[in-house]
Regions:
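N-terminal amphipathic/basic-hydrophobic helices that include classical n-h-c signal peptides
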Residues: 1-29
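A short aromatic-anchored loop/beta-hairpin motif
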Residues: 13-16, 31-165, 169-230
Length: 230
């Protein structure tokens, strides 16, 4: 169903609300128009390790709203990813004993699963952090915990090089594919390492990620964070 270029997305929603009073199929119309507005009609690539999942603007789950997720593992049995733009109020000092500057190293919330586990995403590679797994060009996940502690305790730079993440996002077999088919996520095969490792606020990183997806998605950044407030 086409959208007239002369209408803004807000004009369109107003028109749809008007129609809802007289059209019993409003739910189906809303779904179709929503998909069209958000440029999701193109077939998404199959997810793979190192891909980025970007939540569409209308996802309102408290955990995943405007989330940017790096897939760190994916196979036929399921998927694992970490949200990279969900800063918490906690620091590394809350989970590891160390020098006072540990209080300046933030913790991120990677998802609702395994909140008693801490993970680390970094750019350091196996020469510095043995046994880490490369998940994308220039990005590594996990590795030798003692090596990580030594690196940080020695005062080596962390900003832009390491993110400490509590919890993760997990999908069982077929679950992520189902969510993608519902257009909850769009997939980016390659994304800037500096963006993933940046310390922007959640909404700012999401908007920057939208920009990296190209021109056709830029209308997403005009969508209010809380549409009900408008």
């Amino acid at each position: 169903m086409g959208v007239r270029p002369s209408l803004s997305i807000f004009d369109l929603w107003a028109e749809l609300l008007r129609r809802s009073a007289v059209n019993s199929n409003f739910g189906l119309i809303m779904e179709e128009i929503s998909i069209d507005i958000f440029n999701l009609l193109d077939k998404q690539p199959d997810p793979a390790r190192g891909n980025v999942l970007l939540a569409k603007p209308t996802v309102d789950d408290a955990c995943f709203k405007r989330s940017v997720i790096l897939l760190v593992d994916h196979d036929s049995e399921g998927s694992m990813g970490v949200i990279v733009n969900r800063l918490t109020d906690y620091t590394l000092a809350d989970v590891i004993e160390g020098p006072d500057y540990f209080q300046e190293i933030p913790l991120y919330m990677g998802g609702p699963v395994g909140l008693n586990q801490m993970f680390f995403l970094h750019t350091l590679g196996p020469d510095v952090i043995p046994n880490c797994m490369q998940v994308a060009r220039g990005l590594y996940f996990g590795g030798d915990y003692e090596a990580v502690k030594r690196y940080v305790a020695c005062g080596e730079p962390v900003e832009g090089k390491m993110k400490f993440i509590v919890g993760y996002s997990g999908w069982e077999k077929g679950q992520l594919a189902d969510e993608i088919s519902r257009f909850d996520w769009v997939i980016q095969k390659h994304i800037d390492e500096a963006l993933i490792m940046g310390d922007q606020e959640a909404d700012d990183m999401w908007k920057a990620a939208v920009e990296s997806f190209g021109e056709k998605y830029r209308t997403w950044n005009n969508w209010p964070t809380n549409p009900s407030d408008n």
